[in-house]
């Protein structure tokens, strides 16, 4: 069996469907499969009738899954998007860090790491983690002669009309326009559509059905132009994309390379243009600053995690909301504690099941003996009734009826397999085992704080690398290849090679001055004492328009009716988004301390 680790369910599905169509016995194991489908898949694995199994990296954190794999001969571990393992990579994913440990535990004899965007530093990191010798590291060239790279320095207020003019030259050719923000994709698509262009927006904020419909329309040629965030493109295999426009600066040269790489896969010439404006740097830097957790929040989480009994479970979602830290940061912290030998992940489980009977309960019970009927009656009596669904908590039910939680979960799965009930599991929790306590908790805390500070600095350096590239006076392709450890004299067909020299600096707009009204607004927000805005960083994020777990909190409208709305509906949300995050953070610190 070859085990393939891939980061996206959509990508796995496309690849497995393609392999099966070619007669190759491949399968995927992911959260979209039903209990019955999962059971059938395991049966096929046990019979060795599957050659390739695709899983997400998180799947290997499941102790039960690893126990099943240990019984199956594994020939190869293939890791797609392997740059995700590197702290220095542009798309670090903490679960990738544990893959080396799992490869050793499962005694997999060979590992294949694949990536299209590894810098020399990231490649060294991958080789170090998987003990890959230098002679086994193979790198193909990043140069593609059919991609014409263009950088156009342009002011924010000129960008939209310039893009319209460019698109009108060939309005029917397949084109992707990348924007940073979801509302940017929406507003730009709306503008271009009003000018008669066949365009649709695409971003993660759309419903999955809408995203699928838009993607299908683009693939078929019905809609040739897509305005999208980076949510669009992974797994898109359309060979005739003729143009890629970066309406905003990309967040790294790795992202830029990945995105322009979607053009011209048929070998024909394609146009890749970056509309470079310094103003974008402020927005991207704000996101980076906003992602960095508060030291006090990290101290609190470490204290909670390392003061647990031997076996415990947590909800990443609950920890995230309680400490106003993004779930990815929580996952990174948990992974770090695992790699340091403090914790060991066991198995995830759902703490709540919504249950709907597909037939009358009495009719269902008639199919069982009296002992099981009694057990099922008691079990369903513990559930909280709703309009269409019962809500059952296995842990609470176990305590009430004196049965094990494992038996209750197994029973729910069994009834679902029989199609006696429909089930919606929710509130995922991850089990952990505490292996040891730190000898010096303050020192460990400081190491964790430093870890996230390094991450912030690394992300900011990548942003600056994009600006440096945009201002290069020499060949753009040579500049890009140098970033990935390749050498090239000049390509002869980029905008620099065609004689278009860059300005000394990218066009930029000055941040507006803060007014007395702005300072008064900040103080009023402090005086509200909202739970989601109690720290300077949370308040600064809110004012700069960044979403975080805290912005999902509710606040009471000041009308005396005790009506609640989410914080992001507040008039002050994103009011200071044109200001640098660091400046707003300093003001918030001064106001809260005062």
Where are these regions (language model features)?
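Helicase motor core with emphasis on the C-terminal RecA-like subdomain
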Residues: 1-3, 10-364, 370-371
């Amino acid at each position: 069996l070859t085990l393939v680790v891939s980061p996206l369910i959509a990508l796995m599905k496309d690849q497995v469907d393609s392999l099966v169509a070619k007669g190759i016995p491949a399968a995927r194991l992911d959260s979209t499969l039903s209990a019955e489908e999962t059971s059938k898949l395991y049966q096929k694995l046990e019979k060795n009738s599957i050659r390739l199994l695709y899983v997400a990296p998180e799947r290997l954190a499941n102790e039960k899954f690893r126990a099943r794999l240990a019984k199956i001969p594994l020939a190869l571990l293939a890791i797609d998007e392997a740059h995700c393992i590197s702290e220095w990579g542009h798309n670090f994913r903490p679960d990738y860090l544990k893959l080396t440990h799992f490869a050793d535990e499962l005694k997999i004899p060979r590992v294949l790491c694949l990536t299209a965007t590894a810098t020399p530093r990231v490649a060294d990191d991958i080789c170090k983690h998987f003990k890959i010798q230098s002679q086994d590291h193979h790198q193909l060239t990043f140069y593609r002669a059919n991609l014409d790279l263009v950088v156009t320095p342009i002011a924010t207020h000129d960008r939209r009309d310039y893009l319209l003019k460019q698109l009108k030259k060939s309005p029917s050719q397949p084109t992707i326009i990348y924007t940073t923000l979801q509302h940017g994709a929406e507003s730009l698509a709306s503008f271009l559509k009003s000018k008669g262009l066949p365009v649709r927006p695409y971003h993660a904020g759309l419903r999955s059905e809408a995203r699928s419909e838009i993607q299908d329309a683009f693939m078929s040629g019905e809609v040739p132009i897509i305005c999208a965030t980076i949510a669009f493109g992974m797994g898109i295999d359309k060979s005739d994309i003729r143009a890629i426009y970066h309406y905003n600066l990309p967040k790294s040269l790795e992202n830029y390379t990945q995105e322009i790489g979607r053009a011209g896969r048929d070998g024909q010439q394609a146009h890749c243009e970056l509309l470079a404006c310094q103003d974008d740097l402020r927005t991207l830097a704000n996101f980076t600053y906003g992602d960095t957790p508060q030291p006090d929040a990290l101290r609190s989480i470490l204290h909670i995690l390392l003061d647990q009994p031997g076996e415990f479970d947590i909800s990443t979602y609950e920890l995230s909301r309680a400490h106003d830290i993004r779930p990815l940061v929580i996952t990174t912290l948990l992974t770090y504690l695992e790699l340091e030998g403090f914790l060991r992940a066991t198995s995830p489980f759902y703490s709540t099941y919504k249950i709907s009977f597909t037939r009358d309960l009495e009719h269902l019970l008639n199919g069982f003996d009296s002992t099981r009927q009694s057990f099922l009656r008691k079990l369903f009596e513990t559930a909280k009734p709703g309009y269409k669904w019962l809500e059952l908590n296995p842990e609470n039910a176990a305590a009430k009826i004196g049965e094990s939680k494992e038996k209750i979960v197994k029973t729910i799965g069994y009834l679902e397999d029989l199609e006696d009930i429909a089930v919606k599991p929710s509130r995922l929790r991850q089990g952990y085992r505490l292996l040891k306590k730190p000898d010096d908790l303050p020192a460990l805390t400081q190491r964790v704080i430093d870890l996230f500070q390094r991450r912030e600095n690394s992300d900011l350096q990548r942003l600056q690398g994009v600006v440096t590239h945009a201002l290069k006076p020499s060949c753009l392709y040579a500049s890009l290849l140098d970033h990935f450890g390749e050498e090239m004299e000049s390509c002869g067909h980029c905008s620099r090679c065609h004689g278009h020299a860059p300005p000394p600096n990218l066009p930029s707009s000055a941040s507006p001055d803060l007014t007395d009204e702005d300072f008064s607004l900040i103080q009023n927000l402090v005086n509200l004492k909202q739970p989601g805005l109690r720290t300077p960083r949370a308040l600064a994020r809110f004012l700069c328009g960044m979403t975080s777990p805290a912005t999902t909190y509710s606040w009471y409208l000041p009308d005396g009716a005790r009506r609640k709305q989410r914080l992001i509906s507040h008039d002050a949300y994103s009011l200071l988004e044109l200001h640098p995050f660091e400046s707003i953070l300093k003001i918030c610190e001064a106001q809260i301390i005062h």
